Amino acid sequence: MAKISKRVAANKAKVERTKFYPIDEALSLVKECASAKFDESIDVAVQLGIDAKKSDQVVRGSVVLPAGTGKSVRVAVFAQGEKAEQAKAAGAEIVGMEDLAEQIKAGNMDFDVVIASPDTMRVVGTLGQILGPRGLMPNPKVGTVTPDVATAVKNAKAGQVQFRVDKAGIIHATIGRRSFEPAALKSNLAALLDALSKAKPASSKGVYLRKIAVSSTMGVGVRIDQATLSA
C-alpha cells in the first residue's frame, strides 16, 4: 500500500487541481501519470450546462471514435433470418432469438454490447430487468435497436462508445488507452465533444460544455482549457 500511496502522491504533485491546461499538455500529463502496470484507460468527464432532472434535458447518444477504444468488443445480436446472417457476417460473436434470451436469463452474458432488430423487441423486452441495470439494454437512441444490424455491429467493433448524462449533469466516457498516441486521444475527444454538441437539448440555456477533465484509471484528473481544443 505504501508504494501505491507514494505513486498517487507523486502524480498529484504534478497536477495543479485548479489550473486549466492546454489540451496537448493535459493529455501528456494524464499519460505520464498513468503509471500502473496495466494499459490504463483514458477517460473524460464533461460537465454539461443542463438540468439533468428535467426529462427534456437528458443527453444520450453514441459516437464511433476515429481511433477506436483499444478494447476488444464482443457483440450479441437479436435477429432472425437474413438479418441474423448479416450480423454474423459483420462479426457478431453471438446471434439468436429465444435461445439467446434464455442464455441471458441463465446468467450467461459473455458480451459487451447487445444489438437488436426492431422485430425482435417482443423477445428483448422481457430482458429489461436483466440488461437495463448493466447498461446493455438495446435502445434506438444509441443505435442499438436498428434494422441495419450489420452496420451496428461494425460500429460497435470499430470503437463506438455510448454516453448518457448522470444525475449531476456529467457525461463520463472512455476515449482510449495509455498506449494511444496523444493525437489519437485528441481526435477521439474531439469526436465525443462534437457528438455531445449535436445532442444538446433545445431547452438548454447558457454555456453547454462547462468543464472538461481527463484522467486515467488510476491517475488524477486534469482540467482542459477549452480555448485550446481547436488548436
Swiss-Prot record:
Q: Which UniProt keywords apply?
A: Repressor, Ribonucleoprotein, Ribosomal protein, RNA-binding, rRNA-binding, Translation regulation, tRNA-binding
Looking at the UniProt record for this protein, which Gene Ontology cellular component terms does it annotate, in alphabetical order? cytosolic large ribosomal subunit
Any one GO MF term held by the record is: tRNA binding
Q: Does the keyword DNA damage apply?
A: no
A single Gene Ontology biological process assigned to it is: translation
Superkingdom field: Bacteria
Q: Which Pfam families match?
A: Ribosomal_L1 (PF00687)
Q: State if Cell membrane is listed as a keyword.
A: no
Outline the subunit composition: Part of the 50S ribosomal subunit.
Family membership noted in the UniProt record: Belongs to the universal ribosomal protein uL1 family.
Purpose: Binds directly to 23S rRNA. The L1 stalk is quite mobile in the ribosome, and is involved in E site tRNA release. Protein L1 is also a translational repressor protein, it controls the translation of the L11 operon by binding to its mRNA.
Q: What's the protein name? A: Large ribosomal subunit protein uL1
The organism is Ralstonia nicotianae (strain ATCC BAA-1114 / GMI1000) (Ralstonia solanacearum)
- UniProt gene name: rplA
